Amino acid sequence: SFLPEEDQGVFLTMIQLPAGATQERTQKVLDQVTDYYLKNEKANVESVFTVNGFSFSGQAQNAGMAFVSLKPWEERSGDENSAEAVIHRAKMELGKIRDGFVIPFNMPAIVELGTATGFDFELIDQAGLGHDALTQARNQLLGMAAQHPASLVSVRPNGLEDTAQFKLEVDQEKAQALGVSLSDINQTISTALGGTYVNDFIDRGRVKKVYVQADAKFRMLPEDVDKLYVRSANGEMVPFSAFTTSHWVYGSPRLERYNGLPSMEIQGEAAPGTSSGDAMALMENLASKLPAGIGYDWTGMSYQERLSGNQAPALVAISFVVVFLCLAALYESWSIPVSVMLVVPLGIVGVLLAATLFNQKNDVYFMVGLLTTIGLSAKNAILIVEFAKDLMEKEGKGVVEATLMAVRMRLRPILMTSLAFILGVLPLAISNGAGSGAQNAVGIGVMGGMVSATLLAIFFVPVFFVVIRRCFKG
């Protein structure tokens, strides 16, 4: 993953009912969600704030959101009371609601990179196949994703489903013959049905806004549109029925574009035990089976994760090269940097073992800890190698004798500096509450790397130094 999940003390729940569902029906589902959190999770949930008619998928009567505020972290000690655990239980229970989709999800660690944790997948109509073909491809992809519950969970479209729409068609030739302009037609429709701001007026010392709109009872039915009138160029009032026809159609309530092309967003998460990289690779594999002309791309945190994942090998390689060149310039030797850099993998092994044991993910903070361990591992080796080099050059001792003396004399400084650093990152490794995800990712990785680099370096650095010196001497 790009960033670890954080317990921010609040998470979201999105409610999506079938297209055409009324606001009252949506409210009943919101009430069920609220009752669940306040009764079943009363030990962890402080309050629930619901919004009817709005969600991240769009504004509609069949959409809703619930903002769940958790109690302070000191009152929710233990992994079973974390936001992640509460969300997991909510998915199991709220998934039983048959009247619509109820999807609890955590907020991203960086809000600017998306609206939810997991991946953001854009399905794109690259060949102009049309809305129906894109919808069919989306449903096909969702069906294939549902067949992999061990790798993918909560795979869902992030948008509003097609619904009934009232389409008003204007016969421009008739309107022109009657002396009615299109701008007047649009203005009349906008004012009567949506309302138009006119001006302000002062009422008892307060500024109030004036809006013009048809009364509710005159804009409730499709037939009410035919009763609207627009003024023609010669001043006559012309009814809409004279130049318009209307009928019901079925279509998308909003236009979605990605890089200028028709698209549909799909969100989802990796199943427990599956890395986000594997989940994203599986989605790409499934998308490759869709009809020709349907493409895909990543957005939000998934896009950043793809970029950072591709850069990680180069970043580690550059770190190795920079450390090696600095050591070569410092000691004016090629053998010493080689013997020092051979110790770095020992620290990396510790980082990987610690991350595996404590179920840490390969995120950007893990990479920070990994790069830090490279430098710290080299530091321990330098303490031994530099002293052995001085004994060989200034006192004329043999490579084995100088190395053994260096190990004995530098053991205490190695242990002291390493122990100081391990204790320094210990608060990061054991932290909980706000920001603990990022702190754990750095602290656990660096701590594991320092433990392995310290314990193994004492035994392996002398061996590496002796072997490399003899090889270069030979």
Segments from the language model and where they lie:
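Structured binding elements
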Residues: 345, 438, 442-443
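Membrane-helix entry/capping segments
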Residues: 293-315, 358, 364, 436
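Signature of alpha-helical transmembrane segments and their immediate interfacial
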Residues: 1-2, 408
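Loop-to-transmembrane-helix entry motif
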Residues: 301-319, 406-417, 445, 449
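Alpha-helical transmembrane signal-anchor/signal-peptide segments
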Residues: 2-13
